[in-house]
From Swiss-Prot:
Its EC number is 2.3.1.-. The lineage of its organism: Eukaryota, Viridiplantae, Streptophyta, Embryophyta, Tracheophyta. Belongs to the thiolase-like superfamily. Chalcone/stilbene synthases family. Polyketide synthase, which uses acetyl-CoA and two condensation reactions with malonyl-CoA to form triacetic acid lactone (also called methylpyrone), a precursor of phytoalexin. May participate in insect and pathogen resistance. The keyword Membrane does not apply. It comes from Gerbera hybrida. Pfam families: Chal_sti_synt_C, Chal_sti_synt_N. The active site is at residue 169. PANTHER family: HYDROXYMETHYLGLUTARYL-COA SYNTHASE (PTHR11877), POLYKETIDE SYNTHASE, TYPE III, THIOLASE-LIKE PROTEIN-RELATED (PTHR11877:SF108). Acetoacetyl-CoA binds at residues 60, 63, 169, 272, 274, 310, 312-313. The keyword Nuclease does not apply. GO terms for molecular function: acyltransferase activity, transferring groups other than amino-acyl groups. This is 2-pyrone synthase.
Length: 402
C-alpha cells in the first residue's frame, strides 16, 4: 500500500482552490405577469376578501399603502385563485394546502425564468454550471425547488445543490456569502444562484387586531433573481459585473422579538416591531465600519450602497444615520417603488439596477462610477448580512460584450 503525507494532502487541497475573487458574471430577473398598482390595492384587497364593511380598517390600510413609497407590485396570487380557494381570504382560516399548491409549482417556474435570462447573458453552456443555490421563503417540499429547477433547466444531474428555505429578507446576502465560498474553494466552478419568492403564503384577510398582517399585505411583492458566480473568469467569453470582496453575518443584540414569522395552518404569520428601523439605524454604522475599514474606507459617500428596502422607514433611517447623500440609496428606493419588498430576491434586483443604471448613465464603473460598495440584507433574528463588492470598469465590460 502507498503512503501519503500531510504535505501531499495540502498540495491536493491547494490545487482545488480557484485563483482570484468570486465574481458576479451574469444577472437575470423575472416577475409574475399580474401587476397591481399600489394606489388601487386597498380597494382590491378589501373587495376580494369580502371585507368592505370594515370601513375604518380599510381607510387605515389605504394610509399604510400610501406610506410605503411603493408604486406597483407583481403578484402571482390572482383574484381567480382566491375565488377558487376562499378560505385564503379568511384571517388564519386553515388554507395551507391551497397556498402550497400555488407556490410549490410557481416558485421553481418563476426561478426558471430568471435563471434562463442569467444563463443567456452569461453566454456559456448550462453544462458548465457546477453548483446550484436555491432560496425561497415559501413552498417547503421534498424534493425541493432546487431539484425542480434542475429538471426545468435540464442541468446536469450531478450539479451540487443547496436548498435554503425561510431565511427571510437577509437571504439575498446569505446566498452571495455561500456562493463566494463555493466559487473560491472549487477551481473552475460556476455557481447558479436563484432566489424566487411568491408571497401567497403571507396573504391573509384583514383583522383589526393584527395590523402587522396588514403591513405585510401592503409591502411584499413577488419576483425571482438569478446570478452566475465564479472565480477566475475567462475574459474572452465571460463578462464580470462585480467582484465579491468579503462577506459577513451577525445577529443584532436584543432583537429576538423584532421580526418573527411562523408557518401555521392558515399560512405564514408576520410580526414586526415598530422600532425595527431604529434597531437597524443603531447598528448600521458598526456594520459599515467592520466591512469597509479593512479597505481604509471611512467616507460612506465614497462607496455605492445596496440596502435591502425592508420598508421606506429603514432606508430613511440608514440614510440619516450615515449622513448619506440623497442619491446614495436611489437603487434601493427604485426597486422598492417598482416591485415592493421581494424578500430574498430584493437585493439581487438592486445589484441589477445599479449596474444597469451605471451603464445607461455612462458611469466609468458598474458601481455608479465608484470602485467599492456595500450590500446589506436585514432579516428575522435580527440577522444582518453584509457583502462588500468591487465594481468593474465599464470600458472593460463593454470590451467584453456587456
Amino acid at each position: 500500500m502507498g503512503s501519503y503525507s500531510s504535505d501531499d494532502v495540502e498540495v491536493i487541497r491547494e490545487a482545488g482552490r480557484a485563483q482570484g475573487l468570486a465574481t458576479i458574471l451574469a444577472i437575470g430577473t423575472a416577475t409574475p405577469p399580474n401587476c397591481v398598482a399600489q394606489a388601487d390595492y386597498a380597494d382590491y384587497y378589501f373587495r376580494v376578501t369580502k371585507s368592505e364593511h370594515m370601513v375604518d380598517l380599510k381607510e387605515k390600510f389605504k394610509r399604510i399603502c400610501e406610506k410605503t413609497a411603493i408604486k406597483k407590485r407583481y403578484l402571482a396570487l390572482t383574484e381567480d385563485y382566491l375565488q377558487e380557494n376562499p378560505t385564503m381570504c379568511e384571517f388564519m382560516a386553515p388554507s395551507l394546502n391551497a397556498r402550497q399548491d400555488l407556490v410549490v409549482t410557481g416558485v421553481p417556474m418563476l426561478g426558471k425564468e430568471a435563471a434562463v435570462k442569467a444563463i443567456d447573458e452569461w453566454g456559456l453552456p448550462k453544462s458548465k454550471i457546477t453548483h446550484l443555490i436555491f432560496c425561497t421563503t415559501a413552498g417547503v417540499d421534498m424534493p425541493g425547488a432546487d431539484y425542480q429547477l434542475v429538471k426545468l433547466l435540464g442541468l446536469s444531474p450531478s450539479v451540487k445543490r443547496y436548498m435554503l428555505y425561510q431565511q427571510g429578507c437577509a437571504a439575498g446576502g446569505t446566498v452571495l456569502r455561500l456562493a463566494k465560498d463555493l466559487a473560491e474553494n472549487n477551481k473552475g466552478s460556476r455557481v447558479l444562484i436563484v432566489c424566487s419568492e411568491i408571497t401567497a403564503i403571507l396573504f391573509h384577510g384583514p383583522n383589526e387586531n393584527h395590523l402587522d398582517s396588514l403591513v405585510a399585505q401592503a409591502l411584499f411583492g413577488d419576483g425571482a433573481a438569478a446570478l452566475i458566480v465564479g472565480s477566475g473568469p475567462h475574459l474572452a467569453v465571460e463578462r464580470p459585473i462585480f467582484e465579491i470582496v468579503s462577506t459577513d453575518q451577525t445577529i443584532l443584540p436584543d432583537t429576538e422579538k423584532a421580526m418573527k414569522l411562523h408557518l401555521r395552518e392558515g399560512g405564514l404569520t408576520f410580526q414586526l416591531h415598530r422600532d425595527v428601523p431604529l434597531m437597524v439605524a443603531k447598528n448600521i454604522e458598526n456594520a459599515a465600519e467592520k466591512a469597509l475599514s479593512p479597505l481604509g474606507i471611512t467616507d460612506w459617500n465614497s462607496v455605492f450602497w445596496m440596502v435591502h428596502p425592508g420598508g421606506r422607514a429603514i432606508l430613511d433611517q440608514v440614510e440619516r444615520k450615515l449622513n448619506l447623500k440623497e442619491d446614495k440609496l436611489r437603487a434601493s428606493r427604485h426597486v422598492l417603488s417598482e416591485y415592493g419588498n421581494l424578500i430574498s430576491a430584493c437585493v439581487l434586483f438592486i445589484i441589477d439596477e445599479v449596474r444597469k443604471r451605471s451603464m445607461a448613465e455612462g458611469k466609468s464603473t458598474t458601481g455608479e462610477g465608484l470602485d467599492c460598495g456595500v450590500l446589506f440584507g436585514f432579516g428575522p433574528g435580527m440577522t444582518v448580512e453584509t457583502v462588500v463588492l468591487r465594481s468593474v470598469r465599464v470600458t472593460a465590460a463593454v470590451a467584453n460584450g456587456n
